[in-house]
Swiss-Prot record:
It is found in: Lysosome membrane. Belongs to the KXD1 family. As part of the BORC complex may play a role in lysosomes movement and localization at the cell periphery. Associated with the cytosolic face of lysosomes, the BORC complex may recruit ARL8B and couple lysosomes to microtubule plus-end-directed kinesin motor. May be involved in the biogenesis of lysosome-related organelles such as melanosomes. This is KxDL motif-containing protein 1. The modification N-acetylmethionine is found at M1. Residues 129-145 have a biased composition (Polar residues). It comes from Homo sapiens (Human). Its main location: membrane. Residues 119-128 have a biased composition (Low complexity). The keyword Membrane applies. GO terms for cellular component: BORC complex; cytoplasmic side of lysosomal membrane. The keyword Acetylation applies. Component of the BLOC-one-related complex (BORC) which is composed of BLOC1S1, BLOC1S2, BORCS5, BORCS6, BORCS7, BORCS8, KXD1 and SNAPIN. Associates with the BLOC-1 complex. Interacts with BLOC1S1. Interacts with DTNBP1/BLOC1S7 (via coiled-coil domain). GO terms for biological process: lysosome localization; organelle transport along microtubule; regulation of endosome size; regulation of lysosome size; vesicle-mediated transport.
Amino acid sequence: MDLPDSASRVFCGRILSMVNTDDVNAIILAQKNMLDRFEKTNEMLLNFNNLSSARLQQMSERFLHHTRTLVEMKRDLDSIFRRIRTLKGKLARQHPEAFSHIPEASFLEEEDEDPIPPSTTTTIATSEQSTGSCDTSPDTVSPSLSPGFEDLSHVQPGSPAINGRSQTDDEEMTGE
C-alpha cells in the first residue's frame, strides 16, 4: 500500500515542479494590469454614455422645438396662401375681364387640406405631418375664409383714411 501513496506523491511533485512560479506571477501581474485597463475603460464608457445621454436629451428638446416651429410656419403659410387664393377669387369675381385668360377649372379646384393636430406629442408624428404635401400654387381658389381673416370686399379700394384710421379699423372697433 505504500507504493500507490508514493506514486501519487511523485505524480503531484512532478506536476508542481512543472509550474514555474515566475511565470505564474507574471500571468497574475498581466491579469491585474488588464483588470485596471478594463476598469478605466469601463469608467470612460460610463462617462461617455452619461454625456451622450445628456446631449441626446438636449438635442431632442431642440429638435422638438424646431419641429413645432416648422409645423407652425407651415400652418401660417397655408393660411397666407388660402387668403391669397380667396382674394384672387374675389378679384376674379369683381374684375372678370382681367382674369379671362385663366381657365375656369383652376378657380373651381379645391385644395386638399392636411389637418394639423393641435398637439405635437411625438417628434416622429410631427415630422411625418410636416413632410405632407402643401399645395402652395396661387392659381387655386379656396372658397372658405380662414379664421381671423378680414373681409375687405365691401370697402372701396381708394377710400381714404380718416385721422390715420381706415374704415376697416372703425369696423373692428365696433365689431369687438
